[in-house]
Amino acid sequence: QMKEELAAHQLQVDIFGDPLSSIWKDRPAMPDSPAFIYDIKYAGKSCEEKISAIRTELKKKGVYALFISALDEIAWTLNLRGNDVHCNPVIVSYLLITQDEVTYFISPEKVTAEVETYLKERQIGIQKYDEVETFLNSFPGKNILIDPGKTNYSIYSSINPQCSILRGESPVALLKAIRNEQEVAGIHAAMQRD
């Protein structure tokens, strides 16, 4: 959106690579805490059920693929948690859901044997986190939905130019907002502990 607004004033923004790495000398490393499975007794729905619901929403809109970069949406969808962000049980990662497959982009050191088995049993492919742009550049899908408010420009610009990019709200945010019985019970229990 910013690129379009600047272009109206004959200004151009070109960002290649990580613009901060050359000036931020003591930048902390990416977090490397392991991912862990969020038990179904707390989640209330399996990740298969959630992925099926997401695919149904995508089909209604004629969308083939959804790229998710919001960490809370990824954690909710896959029933996985982590400790990568202080006071937030999320994992630095990306998720691509198509009508045919699911690909999870995560740093290999975060994937324990238990999590790897969990993902494989659910036919969720694992790709390296830092290979997401290369993957998207060769993505063969007809169209892909991204939430522009939650997706950075580097990811956006790496999507295969032959793929139609649809900008809109992620259906995961709306699905996640509808709490099931186990989630409501968890909220009540947390409030009682507070």
Protein language model annotation of sequence segments:
Residues 1-193:
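Terminal domain-start leader segments
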